Structure formats: C-alpha cells, structure tokens
Amino acid sequence: MTEDVKKADGAAPKKLSLQRRTKTTVSTTAGGKAKEVQVEVRKKRTVPTDAAQKAEEARLKAKQEADRLAAEKAKKDAEEKARLEAEKAKQAKAEEAKKAQAVSAPTKAVDVEKEKRRAEEAELRRKADELARQKAEELARKAAEEAKRYAELSEEDAENENSEDYADYHLTSTYAREAEDEEARRKENRNRGGKNKVAKAKKGGREDESSKTERESNRRNQKDGKMGKGKHAKKGSALQQAFTKPAQAVNRDVVIGETITVAELANKMAVKATEVIKTMMKMGAMATINQVIDQETAQLVAEEMGHKVIIRKENELEESVMSDRDVDAELVTRAPVVTIMGHVDHGKTSLLDYIRKAKVASGEAGGITQHIGAYHVETDGKMITFLDTPGHAAFTSMRARGAKATDIVVLVVAADDGVMPQTIEAIQHAKAAGVPIVVAVNKIDKPEANPERVETELLQHEVVAEKFGGDTQFVYVSAKKGTGVDELLEAILLQSEVLELTAVKDGMATGVVIESYLDKGRGPVATILVQTGTLHRGDIVLCGFEYGRVRAMRNENGKDVASAGPSIPVEVLGLSGVPAAGDEATVVRDEKKAREVALYRQGKFREVKLARQQKAKLENMFTNMAEGDVAELNVIVKADVQGSVEAICQSLNELSTAEVKVKVVGSGVGGITETDATLAAASNAIVLGFNVRADASARRIIESESIDLRYYSIIYELLNEIKAAMSGMLQPEFKQEIIGLAEVRDVFRHPKFGAIAGCMVTEGIVKRNNPIRVLRDNVVIFEGELESLRRFKDDVAEVRNGMECGIGVKNYNDVKVGDQIEVFEVVEIKRTI
C-alpha cells in the first residue's frame, strides 16, 4: 500500500489517496504449451482528512475576529473624537466665564443682552456636539463596512489558495503515478525475453510515446496554472494586447468643393482609391483615380460610404463681393441697344454712317467693318445705341454667356441681292437669343431692287411681315440717299416702347464688354456697354479674368467723359489685361477682393475648358446623357447644295426618339464659316460637313474650342453613324485624314493625259496612290484618283510641301486655275464609349 500526499505552501491536503497493488502468476495451456501470465490488480481509495474542516473553522474565526476588531476600532475612534470636541467646548466656556468676571458690572440692559448671547452660544455648542456625534457614527459605520469588505477579500484569497493547492496536489499525484507505472514497466521488460519481449517492447514504446505526449501536455498546463496565480497574475495579463481593432470604419466630415479628383476624395475619407472606384462602379459611374468628378457625384459617393459631407462654396468670395454693392431700386426708362446685322456688302455700316452723319465707312479697309463699332445717337429727344458687328462673334459670345446686351436686331437685306447665307445666320442668332427683329430692306434706289422678293424669301425662315399677319416690321431704306431712315428710327423706338426697357440709373454700374484690344501707348482698352447704374472715373471694375481702376473713359468720338449711364458705350482704360468680348463688367468696392476674384476665375477657366472639350464629343454623348447633362444632340449641317441640306435635316429629325432627340441648331449651303464654328461652340453642337470644308478662320475656332467636326460624302454614312451613336453601338470608325493639299497655279494640255495641273504643294505631302478631291471655292466638285504625278518630267511617288509638280487627274479634265487638289487617306480608328 502506498500513500500519495503532497503539501504545497505548507497547507495540509483535504483528501488522502490510498493505492494497493497485488501481483499474481496464472499458468495457462495454449497449443499444447504451458504459458505463465502475470496479473496485477490495483485498488485505490480516497479518504478525506480533517484539514479541510479545520481550515474552514480557522477562516470563520479569522473573519469574526476581523469584524470585532474593526468595530472596536471604529467605536474607540468615535469616542475619542467626541471626547476631544467636548473638552474644546468646555475650555471655551471656561474662558468666556473668566472674561465675564473680569469685566465690570454692566447695567441691567447689558446683562439681558449677555444672557441672550450665552443662550445662543449654548445652542451653537449643542448643535456642534450633535454634529460631532453624527460624524463619529458615520465614521464607525464606514469602518465597519471596510472591515467587512476586508474579511470577504481574505475569504476569497483563502479559497483561491486552497483550490490552487488542490490542483497542484492532483497534478503532482498524476506525475507520481505515471513515474511509478513507468518504473514497473521497465522492470517487466528486463525480466522478459524472446518474441514476447520484443512485442511488449514495441507496445511499451507506443505507450512511452503516448505517456510522453501526456506528460508534456500536463507540464504545459501546470506552467500556465502557476503563471496565473498569486502576484504574477497581473504580469501575465500585462503581456497581452491592450487594444482591439475597430469593428467599423470611422465616419469623417468630408469637405467637398465644386470639383474633386477620385484620389483626393479617397484621401479625405481615409480609404483607398480602389474602394471609392468600386463604390462608384456599384452606383453605375465609371472613373479613374485621377478623374475629376463634380460636387454632386462626390457627395453621393461619400454619403454611400457612410461619411458626412460638408459642401464648400468656392465662389463664396465672389458672391460676397457681388452682393456688397449699393444699387438704387428706382427704375427709369433706358435707351434701346440695337445691333445691325446682315450679309456682307448689304450696307450695314453705310446705313449706320448716315444715321450718325459721319463718314466712317471710307476709313475702313476695303469698306469692310474691321471691329465692333458702338455709337449712340439722339432722335426726337430720344437716344438709341447702335452696335455694328462683323461676323457676329461678340453677339454669339454674349448669348453664350447669358448676357442679353442687345434689345433689338436690325436685319439689313439688300433689295437687289435678297436673302443670303449670312442673312440666314443672323436670323438664327437673333432667334436663339430671343431678340425681336426689324428688317431694313436697303438699296431700294437701285433699278434692279425687288423688296417684295425679300419679304417672300424671309417667309421661308419664319420672319413674317406685318402685312402678312406677322409681327416683324419691314422698312424700305436707302443708306446712300437717306430714304426711309427716319421711318427706321421710328420703328426702332416703337419696338422699344413695346419692350418697356428700364434700368437702374444711380448706383454701382454693371455692363458688358463689346470689344477689347491692346493699345501700344494706352495699354488694355475695353469698350464697355453700361447696362445698369452709372460708371464713374475712378471706379474699381471687375471684368471677367481682369480687374482694375478706371483711369480714363472716352466716348465713341474720342472725347473724355467723367461718367456713363445705362445703354451708353464707353472706352475704359486701366484694366490689368485685355478681357474677352462678352465678359460682364461689374463695379466693386475693394480692389484687393476684386484681384482675388479675378485670380480665382482664371484658375477655374482651365477646368471649365477641359470639361467643355469632352461634352461635344459624339463618343461621349451617352455618358453625358447618363449624367443628365445632355438631353438632346445638337447638330449644325452644312452641305454643297440646298437639296442635300433639306434631305439631311429631314432624315435627322426622323431619327429622333422619345429618349434621344436630334436638334438641328443651324443649317446652310456652302463652306463651314467662322460663324458656324462660333455658333457650335455656343450651343454645344457637332458640325457635320457634307461635301464642304471649313475655312482657315473656322478651323482656328474649331481647334481652340475643341469642336467635333466631321466630313461626309455619302448621306447614308452620315445617317448610319448618327443612328449608331444614338443606339449606343459605335462601330470601328474609318476616318479620312487629309495628308496633303496642292493649289493649281496653271493648266497645261497634254495629248495623252488631257488637262495637266501645274500645282504648288501648300500643305503636307501629295502621294500618287492616294485618293484625291478637287475643291473649288471650298466645295467638292470631283472625287477620284491621280493618273500621273511628275516633277521635272520625272514620275515621282510623292511631293512634299513647298515643291512644284504636275498632276494629272484620272477621268477629269475640267481643272481650272485656283482649284485645290486635296489628297487624303482612309484610317481605321477603334472607338470607345
């Protein structure tokens, strides 16, 4: 019999385990052989000891003793404090009595007062004693609670120690039993031999491995148990991580301006840019990391990702500057602003010259208006301001910027020439701006004049005369003889009365820039038409991207003026730079703030220009529609003949559906002009050229404004491409690239090749095997291929820019001096939506 007893930290075990082992040998016969088998019988009994009962009694006794000691201590402290308070009160009373005896006998009234004071002092002392007693009781109660809490903690510690001792005891008992079993197995293996010995050794080896694994596991458990008890418990917990990862993303306040890139938005939300792009893809918007998105899209993305959005107004300074202006609320009648428009050489400037009684037309190059002239005249005590425009560029710019500077359009049509292309363009501009038209039929003094034909032709363009039941006034005039000029002025004044034109006269002025240029001696000069208020010399003017103080003002006759009221045009000096035609001019208070606003506008201009370049692209039409920016596809159609124009416009209108509409903004016959390009830029339109080309001035505007210009020679290709764009299925594009242009200087006759054109290559390279077109006055008259290309009697494959050559066009002999031969090649371009 063995007894396993373990004492840990001096504590007696609560139980005793008694083990008894009996070994016997049994003889058996198997297969005719006698075999001895050893049998071992183990018995175990656990007997509880008196140690547990004694420990429990000791714990209860310690708890009672601690409670008694704490109560006695609290009681003694309270009694001591009360005794000290009473002694202090007694001493104070004795001192008062001694002082009272030293003082001479007072009068009866004084004695009554002293008695009253003594009664009050006695009451105060009684209250003080009561307060001291309450404090002593409170202290005693707190001390008792602390003693009770201390006893409970002591009890918990004792229980923990007992449980630890019990665990250590059992762990150690297991090890002791395992060690004893191992020793017994080793003895058995030493006494055995042969196969049984080998078999038992193998079995014992497996048992050794299992027991070894068990011992290692128990050893780890024992080590962990020791680390978690006693003083080392806090150290073990201190080694653990003291924080956890947040379960959700932190919501932030995201400040968003008018525009922001995807990368900047991700940085403000403290997330990866890929997460922002994923969110945008889920919302149906495709974007790259450097793409600029608008404020509304950025707000939706940030709110979708759980952040709070703060909208920042970047133009807050501009709004504050514009709002800080004193404008008198009193409205007065103002003079009408009249724009003279019409075809070239129909007499616009001559008519205006006769009205002003000044010979200005002779001073202009070739009699053609080189710049905008702004003048005001008085008739019958009433004033009229006239604008004479070349090409209507400023008028279109004003309309594009929303500045309605013109009140009435006087459309000048020559009676002997009729309605011409620029006349139609002028009508389109006036209707787009919503301005009434007064038609002046000029040159009626000529023998071939036919004013009735002009009225009939204008009916086709929805300009209906009053005698036909319309609302458009027709006046027959002669700018040369002055016939009908007074009637024209009366018609203008009558139209202005119908419009009831009013403006604020007093206050800070606003206006629009009619024209501007850079003078070598005076610097930037801007002609400003005042619309409201009065412009004074010395005012601070904010004008588009420029600003400055008005140093001098001059009227149309070159005389200095101190102020200018509504509808008065003046030349202004003192701006920081040359503003653009159509910019709004505003008088502000602070020059420093005006400079800040001008710099802010300059910074925003680049972003607006980049955004505008993408809007008019045919490939991006559906993207813009998805964003809600484009509800219809604006188109300008120019063709070589009127029949093609009518057929294309009718076919495009038939393509319109309920979702996508094709709107023909303008159409006409002839080459693409500067006016077409300006109208396309203002109305965000695509220019379609059918057998026509754009001239140099139009190409400059198209390149600077990034207008989408497309050339076609087959109407079905034009319609199919527009149809493919509308259906969203853009096929691979075969684009015609012009690689060379040759100008015909002379024509020679050859017996074999027919007409040979002696040409000078003006642009690019002329190649022999490429297709060509013959242009006359920018209109395609033949399309084919070259039959021969020679230079100094030698056949060559190509001729470069600046060289002369002889060109023979196959199956075409009607080449004339001044024609242009255009060489192009067909290039396949893959489209992306």
From Swiss-Prot:
GO cellular component: cytosol
Region G2, annotated ranges: 367-371
Skewed-composition ranges (Basic residues): 187-203
Organism, as annotated: Pasteurella multocida (strain Pm70)
InterPro entries the UniProt entry points to: EF-G-like_DII (IPR053905), EFTu-like_2 (IPR004161), IF2_assoc_dom_bac (IPR013575), IF2_II (IPR044145), IF2_N (IPR006847), P-loop_NTPase (IPR027417), Small_GTP-bd (IPR005225), T_Tr_GTP-bd_dom (IPR000795)
Biased composition (Basic and acidic residues): 53-99, 110-152, 204-227
Function, as annotated: One of the essential components for the initiation of protein synthesis. Protects formylmethionyl-tRNA from spontaneous hydrolysis and promotes its binding to the 30S ribosomal subunits. Also involved in the hydrolysis of GTP during the formation of the 70S ribosomal complex.
Region (G1) residue spans: 342-349
Keyword Cytoplasm recorded: yes
Record-listed GTP binding positions: 342-349, 388-392, 442-445
Locations listed in the record: Cytoplasm
Phylogenetic classification of the source organism: Bacteria, Pseudomonadati, Pseudomonadota, Gammaproteobacteria, Pasteurellales
Pfam families in the record: EF-G_D2, GTP_EFTU, GTP_EFTU_D2, IF-2, IF2_assoc, IF2_N
Annotated region described as G3, given as residue ranges: 388-391
Name by which UniProt lists this protein: Translation initiation factor IF-2
Biased composition (Acidic residues): 153-166
